[in-house]
Amino acid sequence: MKKHTQVRPKFIVIFICLVLLGCSAFQTVRILPVFDPEATILPQSAAIIHEKNGITAMAVPLNDVKAVDAFGIVIYNSTDHFVSFKQKDCWMLDQARQKTKTIDRSQHTFYLGKNFKPKLPPEFPVEVFRWNKTIRMQGPPVPLPLEDIEKTTIMPKRRAQFFLYFRKKSISSTSLRIIVPKIRSDYDDTETTFVFKFEVKKG
């Protein structure tokens, strides 16, 4: 006489969870700008632009990078004096108000692969030029020799460009804020902080 095998309810629950988890892995996740009356949004590249104290700061999500939450940052100095900041001081705030520091350079290869080279969205330079023709994104920024290797200094009417990588929070959080703090004026020591507000869309 044949015995009927019974499937226990807990195994059914586990199976359903695994199926749902597998489906979520194939969801498209995009980081997009949140409307801010104090900011300019570039719709094609999803970039956010803030202007304060003669400094223009831009943040653009790199949605083609899947292993981490990645952002391109551009700082343009329109003042007549030098400004400086430290990239390592930048951080991200998630929906739960948890602070996440950038991934250390020594771990970039682990997360991104040996041959990874970050690129800004191709629409971004065109949109920036249309918005402000005095800011040109062509050509690499000119680095300055410094005693402090952690500090980035920007000459008047020049820009700095860099990339920030964070352990992936866009899976669990619906909102992200990128903070670029303490851009210091070498003229009067004024410090300027920029906050970029993004939302996470899944589909």
Spans of model-derived segments:
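Soluble periplasmic/extracytoplasmic beta-strand elements of cell-envelope proteins
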Residues: 58, 70-74, 84, 91
